[in-house]
């Protein structure tokens, strides 16, 4: 029998659209953009299963719930990938690479893959705790998902030998992604628009700096010509007298 540990009191500690099963199970399932798969995952033996749409606050909430339960050692990514957010790929990048000093998920391709409320320590705990990420992205086949859960259960290494890691996210268990002061989920179309707006903003900033340089260069050129004419007239005046 694999060793088990008590999860954080009141686990799951962060609210969400998940279904909860046996907290001693070693498997967590993220159904990404798909709904209706959760109960089947729980029936197959998962500790927690639910969708995740956003590559920032959504991922933060999943990480918070996983690392507050030391028993969860496998993450299964299944269901339809979220267009624009590309949440499944962002999860994989987070597990494989971690985050940078700016909170950005290294190697993530989503529109806004930045974690503002989860620090490096928490991310490294997540990476240590999860021994395998099973990639079933874009798979909604209950049979295949159930088989993956069973395979993970058969390889249960036991709980990580660390206490539950508790993250205090804004809104806590009583709040959601719509709470004031918290990043709000956006549609894939809006994510793409925001990404393009950032690119446009950067281009405008560059063009502004270029315009300032050109204006300075032009003004300097005019001043140089005026100074040259003044000196020429001065010299001619001296020579004439």
Swiss-Prot record:
Compartments reported by the entry: Cell membrane
Q: Name one GO cellular component term.
A: plasma membrane
Which UniProt keywords are listed?
Answer: Cell membrane, Cobalt, Membrane, Methanogenesis, Methyltransferase, One-carbon metabolism, Transferase, Translocase, Transmembrane, Transmembrane helix
Name the top EC class: translocase
User: What are the EC numbers?
Assistant: 7.2.1.4
Membrane topology recorded in Swiss-Prot or TrEMBL: Single-pass membrane protein
Catalysis: reaction(s) = 5-methyl-5,6,7,8-tetrahydromethanopterin + coenzyme M + 2 Na(+)(in) = 5,6,7,8-tetrahydromethanopterin + methyl-coenzyme M + 2 Na(+)(out)
What is the UniProt remark on how the cofactor binds and its stoichiometry? Answer: Binds 1 5-hydroxybenzimidazolylcobamide group.
Q: Which GO terms describe its biological process?
A: methanogenesis, from carbon dioxide; methylation; one-carbon metabolic process
Residues recorded as binding 5-hydroxybenzimidazolylcob(I)amide, renumbered to this chain, are 85
Cytoplasmic face: residue ranges?
Answer: 1-220
Report TM segments: 221-241
Q: Which Pfam families match?
A: MtrA (PF04208)
Q: Name one GO molecular function term.
A: tetrahydromethanopterin S-methyltransferase activity
| Entry cofactors | 5-hydroxybenzimidazolylcob(I)amide
InterPro entries, per this entry?
MeTrfase_MtrA/MtxA, MtrA
Q: How does it assemble?
A: The complex is composed of 8 subunits; MtrA, MtrB, MtrC, MtrD, MtrE, MtrF, MtrG and MtrH.
**Family membership noted in the UniProt record:** Belongs to the MtrA family.
This molecule's function is given as: Part of a complex that catalyzes the formation of methyl-coenzyme M and tetrahydromethanopterin from coenzyme M and methyl-tetrahydromethanopterin. This is an energy-conserving, sodium-ion translocating step.
Protein known as: Tetrahydromethanopterin S-methyltransferase subunit A
């Amino acid at each position: 029998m694999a060793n088990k540990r008590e999860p954080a009191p009141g686990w799951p500690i962060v609210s969400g659209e998940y279904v909860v099963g046996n907290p001693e199970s070693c498997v967590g399932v993220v159904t990404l953009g798909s709904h209706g798969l959760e109960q089947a995952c729980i029936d197959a033996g998962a500790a927690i299963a639910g969708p995740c749409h956003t590559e920032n606050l959504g991922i933060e909430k999943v990480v918070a719930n996983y690392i507050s339960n030391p028993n969860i050692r496998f993450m299964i990514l299944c269901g339809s990938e979220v267009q624009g957010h590309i949440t499944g790929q962002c999860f994989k990048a987070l597990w494989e690479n971690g985050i940078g000093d700016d909170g950005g998920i290294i190697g993530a391709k989503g529109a806004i893959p930045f974690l503002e409320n989860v620090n490096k320590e928490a991310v490294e705990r997540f990476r240590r705790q999860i021994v395998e990420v099973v990639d079933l992205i874009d798979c909604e086949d209950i049979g295949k998902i159930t088989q993956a859960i069973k395979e993970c259960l058969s390889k249960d290494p036991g709980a990580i030998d660390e206490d539950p890691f508790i993250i205090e996210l804004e809104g806590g268990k009583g709040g959601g992604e719509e709470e004031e002061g918290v990043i709000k989920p956006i549609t894939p179309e809006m994510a793409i628009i925001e990404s393009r707006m950032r690119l446009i903003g950067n281009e405008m900033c560059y063009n502004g700096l270029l315009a300032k340089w050109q204006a300075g260069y032009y003004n300097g050129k005019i001043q140089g010509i005026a100074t040259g004419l003044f000196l020429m007239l001065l010299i001619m005046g001296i020579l004439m007298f």
